[in-house]
Amino acid sequence: MERIKELRDLMSQSRTREILTKTTVDHMAIIKKYTSGRQEKNPALRMKWMMAMKYPITADKRIMEMIPERNEQGQTLWSKTNDAGSDRVMVSPLAVTWWNRNGPTTSTVHYPKVYKTYFEKVERLKHGTFGPVHFRNQVKIRRRVDINPGHADLSAKEAQDVIMEVVFPNEVGARILTSESQLTITKEKKEELQDCKIAPLMVAYMLERELVRKTRFLPVAGGTSSVYIEVLHLTQGTCWEQMYTPGGEVRNDDVDQSLIIAARNIVRRATVSADPLASLLEMCHSTQIGGIRMVDILRQNPTEEQAVDICKAAMGLRISSSFSFGGFTFKRTNGSSVKKEEEVLTGNLQTLKIKVHEGYEEFTMVGRRATAILRKATRRLIQLIVSGRDEQSIAEAIIVAMVFSQEDCMIKAVRGDLNFVNRANQRLNPMHQLLRHFQKDAKVLFQNWGIEPIDNVMGMIGILPDMTPSAEMSLRGVRVSKMGVDEYSSTERVVVSIDRFLRVRDQQGNVLLSPEEVSETQGTEKLTITYSSSMMWEINGPESVLVNTYQWIIRNWETVKIQWSQDPTMLYNKMEFESFQSLVPKAARSQYSGFVRTLFQQMRDVLGTFDTVQIIKLLPFAAAPPEPSRMQFSSLTVNVRGSGMRILVRGNSPVFNYNKATKRLTVLGKDAGALTEDPDEGTAGVESAVLRGFLILGREDKRYGPALSINELSNLAKGEKANVLIMQGDVVLVMKRKRDFSILTDSQTATKRIRMAIN
């Protein structure tokens, strides 16, 4: 108060006022502070001071032709005096008002195109619904989130090239547009922005928003997709949340969601195939998500999820160095350990070989619904601080941490035998065996763990073996916290290796990911996922396998046909028949296969009844390992629509129906395509009459000398082979029959065999 009174007294003297308003500021330090560098030191003051002047704006001389000297009220809009130090004109703020009201108008057609992201945001907010506000403690954890909805996923460099090409097409500088998405976007934007009058720099900024993913590390409780993040400030505070449903979806969120589903499906499918890694790569390369190749999306999309990271590792891309266990992402924040193999005994006296981590370590554990901080020593949990959405989520985190700690009391809590297997019927490794066991039932684990009295610490409470909160006691070393644990913020990526069984390791050999870590959650993808690989036919169920298998045979009939007669074993081993085996009753697979292979062999040799439709129909059955048997079948069973349905060996059935008139095949009532060649008996031509007594083996084979004419054939001995010129001017290889009894069928067969050999 004293100071203020003193100042008031000073101000009342006229001399003080004069000193403060008239004298120059000549202290060098002050002048330096406000004049050095281009950076404005006090922008607000500068603005106020400038706007108080009559002509605070300078403009190009051309403005004098475009704006009158005075407005309707007679106020001066610009001054004839030049701006000191340049040949620009001094202009009044009133000129801006005049220009806005009376200046030239331009076409607005480009605005929604350039400012697309803003227009779309307004639409989403207009159609979004805001629910009630709830006051409660918010457990927020920092996660890396996508902050601009509606973007493509180009890298900064790719986007830069696209922007330069669209906005400054005539600038020099090498720009190589390689990826499909780059080319598509460039073409689309060039068309959209023809004759655009918006300042190029502005267009460039807006394009960047549209093309590049921008992420920030933000505290979030709830939805993390970009349409939720754009309203984060409206939906969650420190002690309140407001319910919100977005008024529209954006492609980038849909891509992320669909990518996770595709990756999970592919990893699950690859696990059960003979060579998981090769199968996984084949599927990644042949899958499209929303019309874009999955491998392109994987290269550009930073989504971190177990299955997605396994696919990235297989493609040789870098991934995050954190590892996954029990669906939680672990990041070591302190300490170190060495691995030693130890044998331990479970409560059921089963021996397990586990890799023990010796040493003190600290980890953060982050899951979808719970997070934790874990401190552990060799086979001992020292402290676990958990926070989660609900009791269930907290329990999940506690189980994972207890198993991860490798404590003896956890291993002794096992009741019964551990024999969990993965999808391919292989035993899981011991750590996952333990995890599965306790995820099924953790009662004994929690009961045996032990409890301890707890101190009263702010924001922490205890949790009892039955998962109820307590202020006095808690599971040994375990506390529940109100505060979440932040996700690992670094975006650093490391080089990893992957083995045949899809186990991903860092360069120190630590396992970061394995198929056991891939979530079993099923979801419906937002974008269409097109799996071209035959391995994924079964994703849509047995009917799809059946239809796809027959469609594949018909589409590739030309090559299948040749392999059928010349290299059947290679044909039977084709990957495309793999899925079909799951439809054939296990007990019958090898019998069916033996029967069909024998039948085919007879068609090739003696009987000569080459029947296209029958080959197509029975071929998938021949793919199983055959059992030699003399069994005959008139129909073969496949398991579809929840029961066994029959395919007739001779003739049509609801499962496999060939229409001779239209030459189209329907499988389970679905069209499976048309046969390009005529499988009917047809009319036997002249050759077939003449070739009676000869078996057509296939195409010309030079080892059997020059082609004979049909008349010269009669000189061949039984069993002798020769090339023969037939009427179409084609050469085929034939063999004179060793026995005469099958001569009758030769004439029917010859037509087809010739056709086949020629094709």
Swiss-Prot record:
Key words of the record: Cap snatching, Eukaryotic host gene expression shutoff by virus, Eukaryotic host transcription shutoff by virus, Host gene expression shutoff by virus, Host nucleus, Host-virus interaction, Inhibition of host RNA polymerase II by virus, mRNA capping, mRNA processing, Viral transcription, Virion
GO biological process: one example: viral RNA genome replication
Cellular component GO terms held in the UniProt record: host cell nucleus; virion component
Site positions per UniProt: Avian adaptation: E627
Compartment list: Virion; Host nucleus
InterPro entries per UniProt: Flu_PB2_2nd, Flu_PB2_6th, Flu_PB2_C, Flu_PB2_CAP-bd, Flu_PB2_middle, Flu_PB2_N, INV_PB2, PB2_helical
Pfam families: Flu_PB2_1st, Flu_PB2_2nd, Flu_PB2_3rd, Flu_PB2_4th, Flu_PB2_5th, Flu_PB2_6th, Flu_PB2_7th
Motif Nuclear localization signal per record, residues: 736-739
One Gene Ontology MF term: RNA binding
Record has Translocase as a keyword: no
Family: Belongs to the influenza viruses PB2 family.
Oligomeric and partner information: Influenza RNA polymerase is composed of three subunits: PB1, PB2 and PA. Interacts (via N-terminus) with PB1 (via C-terminus). Interacts with nucleoprotein NP (via N-terminus).
Role played: Plays an essential role in transcription initiation and cap-stealing mechanism, in which cellular capped pre-mRNAs are used to generate primers for viral transcription. Recognizes and binds the 7-methylguanosine-containing cap of the target pre-RNA which is subsequently cleaved after 10-13 nucleotides by the viral protein PA. Plays a role in the initiation of the viral genome replication and modulates the activity of the ribonucleoprotein (RNP) complex.
Protein name per Swiss-Prot or TrEMBL: Polymerase basic protein 2
